[in-house]
């Protein structure tokens, strides 16, 4: 949660107000914010089970990182293709606030492809887990299929 986690991601976000970030910086910010939150939830659950080894924990971390980033990519996509009533916030607000987004950097189609690639990365990471990962797989799919 500190400077190497969510706080660091928030610092990047606040420092970027009115500026356009490059793709690497945008990804870093989102990995530290949403990615760190999802990583904590996934890995803490695994650690509580006391049945995972370091390799499995790393795979769950990769899963969480991919899903956290996919969530942000989908959020940026929805800001363009959805509507205010569905989103629960003003549609197009990212563009109005001059925020760096994946569609702005990659184009809408490129952002959609990025979200799908991150889903595939997440699902591939779960292959290292010898336990039932069905709920994690469903969550991963939900992240890029959600409408709000």
Question: Language-model segments: which ranges?
Answer:
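All-alpha prenyltransferase/terpene-synthase fold signal
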Residues: 1-148
């Amino acid at each position: 949660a500190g400077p190497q986690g969510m706080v660091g991601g928030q610092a990047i976000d606040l420092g970027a107000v009115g500026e356009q970030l490059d793709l690497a910086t945008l990804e870093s910010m989102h990995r530290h914010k949403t990615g760190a939150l999802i990583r904590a939830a996934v890995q803490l659950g695994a650690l509580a089970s006391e049945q995972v080894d370091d390799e499995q924990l790393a795979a769950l971390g990769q899963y969480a990182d991919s899903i956290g980033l996919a969530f942000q990519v989908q959020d940026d996509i929805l800001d363009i293709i959805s509507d205010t009533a569905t989103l629960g916030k003003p549609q197009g607000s990212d563009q109005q606030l001059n925020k760096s987004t994946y569609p702005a950097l990659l184009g809408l189609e490129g952002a959609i492809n990025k979200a799908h690639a991150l889903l595939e990365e997440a699902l591939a990471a779960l292959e290292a887990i010898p336990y039932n990962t069905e709920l994690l797989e469903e969550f991963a799919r939900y992240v890029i299929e959600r409408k709000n």
